[in-house]
């Protein structure tokens, strides 16, 4: 047994030596283009990514224990999903152990500690989240927050835009309370809590009074956002459509873009909430001329807002590339938003986070000064040539080194670690 351990340690040392050698070669290659790889790694380590708690349990939460409804749906029934707060926290801690960098945790209101009590959404207070605040502090994580308009008997097809004053006031009160909870979180962690407002409101079929519902939504938002809270930042999220709400969405992109621009509110860009042929990255520089900040919900749509696991694909790379090219990192907050119940959920987290990190790192390693110079001088051939050549630069060696220096599994090593966790922990959740 001791001999086997020595062999494993020897192999590990050899692999580390190879990673270091590859990094030195990559460092030299990038330096020739005026890019500092050490600085890129340092920036990546400091750039926060907000993990979404709902991947761990398929958006069920701890309020009612029911599957998500209201235009969203998690598909798949892979065993091992978190069934309570302790299991969810255990899974997030496992995810953190396999990642390098800076992370936040994004909570929906339905993930509060309700203690088995029936606390309705217009009654929720910070008391249901003090445990989360303390746990996050112990994990060296900051919290973000979301109001939850779906999966409730009063959800229906309209919440904040509902003409029925009783239902509408219920959701207005809920959202006001969520903002106060977010403010308490921000004060506790000495860092603003980003509070996202997304409502599913819409219609399955042809709608006659579109303007009426949008006016009601505007008035509801005006009332909700009137309360000044210094330790949180509100952001508003649009959507194309939802399941059962295909014909009309009250909070469309045009509605929220106009509202956020007029009222100086942060805008949420969800990469799954656009037409499949749209390039979401194009919206970054356009919106930032008119809104103060952006919240990014990075997902992977498959024909619609299917919330597949984020990958290192063109859409993700283009999004982060545009953030860096537009010098917008200090005005953008990065979060993930997908929920795949068909695969190991810990693995889903790691794949998505690593995809976001790789996309960020590749953007940090771009020879921007040279590219900008070519563009300013009208050297379009040179610009296109360098854009093409940078695709095969050895950024993978830089990402491997980033993980190695933080004592995190390199490459595919995390697969075995997750398989072990599944066998020892997840498989026993029956």
Predicted regions and their residues:
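Acidic/histidine-rich catalytic cores of soluble enzymes
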Residues: 206-315
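Active-site groove signature of glycoside hydrolases
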Residues: 182-208
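Alpha/beta catalytic barrel-like cores
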Residues: 14-163, 170, 179-181, 191-193, ...
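Short, small-residue-biased leader/transition segments that mark boundaries at the very start
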Residues: 2-7
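Short linear capping/connector segments at secondary-structure termini
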Residues: 200-202, 239, 338
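Secondary-structure boundary elements
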Residues: 10-11, 138-139, 176-192, 218-233, ...
